[in-house]
Amino acid sequence: MKTRAANKIQTKLVTLLYGATFSGKTTLGLQLADFKRNDGKPFRVAVVDAEGGGVDDAVDELEDRGIDTRNIHIFYTQSLQELTTILDKIKNHDTFYEFDEDGNETDEPIVDADGEEFFPDAILIDGTTIFRLTSEQGLLELSKKRNTIKADKDGLVGAERFVKIQGADLEFKDYKKLNYSGQNLVLDLMAIGINVVLTAREKDETVQKMDKNGQQVSVSTGRKVHDSFKGLDYNVKTILHMYQDSETGQICAEVVKDRTRVHKAGDILEDPTLLDWQTVIDKNVDKKEFVLKNDLDKAVETE
């Protein structure tokens, strides 16, 4: 357990941007590089690219408008375990080292535009949808192994064995584990002590209803929600639904929620800018940093 006084504590951004392809999520997230620290220097930004190089084009736009991209470092991974390793490095203030062409860590520290060891003020995780998909696929492979054991035990051969193994699906306990992994990720992000922006794809929101035959069916509500780890929206402070206006083609953002009170829920931002939230950073002057440790695993052990 940990306690603190309710005054003079720094506020960090924890923002989720979700939407369809070409809705401007990555471009908006990379505006973290435009932010200024309380000492006037530009943010150092760590970018985790799980979308297969989608960040690269947006970084070129930053260079075109004069941003020193030496203050940005990009990590390419689709592994939740590797992402957790990066977050642990930030949380522990470990040194970041360059990687060689084979993906092996070297002994050369990563440096920023000032020639100092790189340590991020913010992190952009571009593609939480991918991390959920790879985690889900990993659990599906585990389910296949379970079914292989069952097939061996039942003495199945030929087509029956094939169907038993390849027809494996996630079980209830797998979904519980997947949801736990998502919650653990968000709590890890809130515990690293820097500003966080996440992106996710969108999907149709559905509800379960009875059809005329008395069967449960999924029916779309017409709303778009994030396609990522379940419960992700509860822990973040700000959520923007990104979309492209069908008539004008302009990039817009609907404010789903904003605990920082920079904008109100329901506001529609045309040509949105993340710099609206620079005021949150500016108010941190003379305030103490308070990092709430992620004790989810420890809490489970305690219970």
Model-identified regions with their sequence ranges:
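Glycine-rich, phosphate-binding/catalytic loops in enzymes
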Residues: 64-65, 139-143, 214-216
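Switch/connector loops and helix/strand junctions flanking conserved nucleotide-binding motifs
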Residues: 55-58, 130-135, 140, 205-212, ...
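A short beta-strand-to-loop transition that corresponds to the Sensor-1 phosphate-sensing loop
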Residues: 51, 126-127, 198-203
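Conserved P-loop
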Residues: 2, 6-118, 122, 130, ...
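Short, solvent-exposed beta-strand-terminating loops
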Residues: 123-151
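Phosphate-binding/switch region of NTP-binding enzymes
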Residues: 187-275
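Substrate-engagement module of ASCE P-loop NTPases
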Residues: 147-203, 225-238
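C-terminal regions of RecA-like/P-loop NTPase motor modules
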Residues: 1-2, 9-13, 22, 248-303
